Amino acid sequence: MKKLFTLIALFMSVATSSIADVFVTEYMSVTKGSQVKGSIKADTYYIISGIDQSSREHYLYDNGGRVKGSMSFPSDNESTSSYIWTLQSSGTSWVVVNVGTGKKMNLGSSNGSAISMSDTEQANALHFDSNGYVTILNSNGQAIDMTANGANPTTWAGTATPSGSRRL
């Protein structure tokens, strides 16, 4: 199963514009050269994309308590913010937070588990490779996995190699 995700740094903290307004503008200028390669910055917003088993790119978003994947972005600002993420350091681990909802991503504890969103923080390890791929692993060794159609990402036993990775 492919576990490739992209974390693309969108922009630093914006004081006067809404996140969704800036997101639409910034996303249009993002290139593959903008992907994160080994460092996460505070006050930076990200989109997370993954490749499904049919080699189609999907963008992760919070769909009211469950992480989903979409092959396109919404056109309204309210929905767009659910596609934007931050990564917050919690010592030696990371918490993945959705900007639109403020909820934290929680990977399941076994293969095929749904990826939920909640108020509870889950510590995740980030493993980078030199090509901009990152594996997000929870304490049970589960990583995000795209299903064949990409609509419902789940968890699967991950590795710190490109085949078990996402691009951020």
Predicted regions and their residues:
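Bacterial Sec-dependent N-terminal signal peptides
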Residues: 1-22
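Lectin-like carbohydrate-binding module/patch detector with strong preference for beta-trefoil
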Residues: 21-168
